[in-house]
């Protein structure tokens, strides 16, 4: 069976890709399957740079086609922050509570109409000796004034979706997987899926 590598240790992300490639009889592996690689430091200044860094590094090490994503929250009134620093906005990587607390503090006194934001995702598909391909997806919303909901992770409890009248952490997981920034990026990837599958199966 052919295999594609997803440059993440996040099981949730891996499952999204497993659904896509299962119909092509392509197995999905993640960085959890390659502990010797270790964590890849995200030193880029854009989502695309970070996604490419992860995908190209792993593709080179394993000599296989690799997909990586970099995603984050963009708040307009904060000039795009936290952006590529979303996971470590409060200075501690992946501390959701501290990140949300800092975001709320930085938005104190900002009226609802000016709390517009979006989640962004860039996917990078890297194959050794070939040009890296990129796919992007976004979902628009507003930053709420307090945490609501227990589903999801990260900034989901603060990301209010006017269309649904709920935060991303209040909608069912199935719906989130349909409308999220990552889901929208994957939809773009699916348009070129035949090409990606060819890269994997010809190895």
Curated annotation (Swiss-Prot):
Its EC number is 3.6.1.66. One of its GO terms (molecular function) is metal ion binding. It comes from the Bacteria. Pfam families: Ham1p_like. Mg(2+) binds at residues 41, 70. It catalyses: XTP + H2O = XMP + diphosphate + H(+); dITP + H2O = dIMP + diphosphate + H(+); ITP + H2O = IMP + diphosphate + H(+). Substrate binds at residues 8-13, 71, 153-156, 176, 181-182. The active site is at residue 70. Keywords: Hydrolase, Magnesium, Metal-binding, Nucleotide metabolism, Nucleotide-binding. GO terms for biological process: nucleotide metabolic process; purine nucleoside triphosphate catabolic process. GO terms for cellular component: cytosol. Its cofactor is Mg(2+). Binds 1 Mg(2+) ion per subunit. Pyrophosphatase that catalyzes the hydrolysis of nucleoside triphosphates to their monophosphate derivatives, with a high preference for the non-canonical purine nucleotides XTP (xanthosine triphosphate), dITP (deoxyinosine triphosphate) and ITP. Seems to function as a house-cleaning enzyme that removes non-canonical purine nucleotides from the nucleotide pool, thus preventing their incorporation into DNA/RNA and avoiding chromosomal lesions. HAMAP family: Non_canon_purine_NTPase. Homodimer. Belongs to the HAM1 NTPase family. This is dITP/XTP pyrophosphatase.
């Amino acid at each position: 069976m052919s295999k594609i590598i997803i440059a993440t240790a996040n099981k949730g992300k891996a499952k999204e890709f497993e659904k896509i490639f299962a119909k092509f009889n392509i197995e999905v592996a993640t960085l959890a399957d390659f502990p010797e690689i270790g964590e890849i430091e995200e030193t880029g200044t854009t989502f695309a740079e970070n996604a490419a860094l992860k995908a190209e590094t792993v593709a080179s090490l394993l000599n296989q086609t690799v997909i990586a994503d970099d995603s984050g929250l963009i708040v307009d009134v904060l000039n795009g922050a936290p952006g590529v620093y979303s996971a470590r906005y409060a200075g501690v990587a992946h501390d959701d509570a501290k990140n949300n607390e800092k975001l709320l503090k930085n938005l104190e006194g900002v009226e609802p109409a000016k709390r517009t934001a979006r989640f962004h995702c860039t996917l990078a598909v890297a194959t050794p000796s070939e040009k890296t391909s990129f796919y992007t997806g976004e979902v628009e919303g507003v930053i709420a004034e307090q945490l609501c909901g227990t589903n999801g992770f990260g900034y989901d409890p603060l990301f209010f979706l006017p269309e649904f009248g709920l935060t991303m952490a209040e909608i069912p997981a199935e719906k989130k997987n349909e409308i999220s920034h990552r889901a929208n990026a994957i939809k773009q990837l699916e348009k070129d899926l035949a090409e990606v599958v060819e890269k994997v199966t010809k190895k």
